[in-house]
């Protein structure tokens, strides 16, 4: 396994390979990610895949071998685009057949030098370039999007907020859903009562130990009810830590 490059000036460097570079930075140009981008805390560039196509029509796709609907992105074109930015950063392909994106993988990416992200289109990408360039296939959910650009934006937003100096309150990032293995507890703020619903008394008691206990109990309840898969993994990890 080759060593990953050092972060340039401590910055996370994302290169997005796409047929629609005008979609970037998009939402990544506003809020936390946009401010961090403007301040140089991370770097974003796009690569137009079509620039690496040959011939008068600059075709980036062709019909699927063996027949079938749709078109497939060509291995030679995609490979040239990938090779143009290959510097040792992980190469990711956003695809519904990929491994589900997890907070653990997001943290690992945030700790690295960056990522090269290929946005798929049409029926997919020729399998040979996936194998030949060792692309890591990542999915953001069990549903189909028009292309990988939206998925790439989701991934980068999740990564950027974990970069040093991006979030004003480090604790915020450490207590959110998935960081503890649990979904997040409920939140409340003023007014004290709204439409007959009051803030739970415990949250205004000033007893921080009791508040922490309440929040954990609520997080456990919500996770158990809504995400049995996460709850099972959480319980398994607790048993492992407890040596049971």
Swiss-Prot record:
Subunit details: Homodimer.
Keyword S-adenosyl-L-methionine attached: yes
Keyword Transport: no
Tree of life domain: Bacteria
Function according to Swiss-Prot or TrEMBL: Specifically methylates guanosine-37 in various tRNAs.
Compartment(s) of residence: Cytoplasm
Protein name: tRNA (guanine-N(1)-)-methyltransferase
Pfam families cross-referenced by the UniProt entry: tRNA_m1G_MT
Cystine bridges: none
Residues involved in S-adenosyl-L-methionine binding: 120, 140-145
Keywords associated with the record: Cytoplasm, Methyltransferase, S-adenosyl-L-methionine, Transferase, tRNA processing
Catalytic function, reaction form: guanosine(37) in tRNA + S-adenosyl-L-methionine = N(1)-methylguanosine(37) in tRNA + S-adenosyl-L-homocysteine + H(+)
Primary location recorded for the protein, binned into one broad class: cytoplasm
Xref: InterPro entries: Alpha/beta_knot_MTases, tRNA_m1G_MeTrfase_C_sf, tRNA_m1G_MeTrfase_TrmD, tRNA_m1G_MTases_N, tRNA_MeTrfase_TRMD/TRM10
